[in-house]
Amino acid sequence: MEKLTTITATGVPLRRSNVDTDQIIPAVFLKRVTRTGFDDALFYAWRRDPNFVLNQPEYRDGRILVAGPDFGIGSSREHAVWALHDYGFRVVIASRFADIFYGNTAKNGVLAAIMPQESIELIWKMLEEEPGRQMTVDLETRTVTIDDVVLPFEVNDYVRWRLMNGYDDIDLTLQHEDDIAAYERMRAEKFPFKPKTLPAITEEAETVESAREPEAVEWAGPLADR
C-alpha cells in the first residue's frame, strides 16, 4: 500500500451530510471483488447532474474531499472506499464518519480526517471562493493548511501509523511471517495426527445399469410357459 505522509492537492467541497455508501457507489456496481475499476461508479447518480461538483473542471483533479457530517453511513461495503481511492481521493475530511467506513479507509490507503464542523464550513467557503484551490494535509503534524490558514484534525494513532508506513492487512500479517512458520512447525510436531492432503486415488469406474432398462430375467418356475 502506498505511504501517505503529506499531500498537497485540489480540495473538493461536498456540501452534503449523511452520505451513505449506496450514494458513494450504488449496489449495482458491486459485482466485482477487485479493488480497481470503480472510478466511474463513484457518486454515479449525482454525477449525472452537470452541476455536480465533480463535473466542474476546476475540481476534476481533486484528491482531497471535504464532506458533511456522518459520511460513509449505510451498508458496510468496502467498495465505497475502493471507489474513492480509485477515483484519486487519498483524504476525506468530515466532522463524523461511520465506524465501519472509517475502519475500511485505513486498510485501503485513504485518510479519514475528523475536524469540527466549524472548520469544515471555513474550508468549504475557501474552496468555493477559489475553485481549484490547493490545500495540504500533513499526517505528521495532523494539520490542514490552506494558504495561511492552519487547522488541526483528529486521526486515530493506529490509523496514522498504518497510513504513514503504508501497511495494509497483508503487510501487517507478513511482519509475523517467522512466527507463523514457527507455529506451523510446532503444530506438525505436536499434532502429527492432523489430517493431511493426499493425492486422489483413481479407481476404475464401475458399470452402472440403468434402472429404466433392467436386465432380462429368466423365469424357470412352474408358470414359466404362461
Curated annotation (Swiss-Prot):
Q: How does it assemble?
A: Heterodimer of LeuC and LeuD.
- Per the record, the gene is leuD
- Alphabetical keyword list: Amino-acid biosynthesis, Branched-chain amino acid biosynthesis, Leucine biosynthesis, Lyase
Protein family: Belongs to the LeuD family. LeuD type 1 subfamily.
| Disulfide bridge partners, by residue number | none
* Record-annotated membrane-spanning stretches: none
HAMAP family membership: LeuD_type1
Gene Ontology terms for molecular function = 3-isopropylmalate dehydratase activity
Query: Residues annotated as region Disordered?
Result: 204-226
UniProt protein name: 3-isopropylmalate dehydratase small subunit
Lineage: superkingdom: Bacteria
UniProt pathway: Amino-acid biosynthesis; L-leucine biosynthesis; L-leucine from 3-methyl-2-oxobutanoate: step 2/4
What's the Enzyme Commission number for this chain? 4.2.1.33
PANTHER family in the cross-refs:
3-ISOPROPYLMALATE DEHYDRATASE SMALL SUBUNIT (PTHR43345:SF5), 3-ISOPROPYLMALATE DEHYDRATASE SMALL SUBUNIT 2-RELATED-RELATED (PTHR43345)
Catalytic activity annotation:
(2R,3S)-3-isopropylmalate = (2S)-2-isopropylmalate
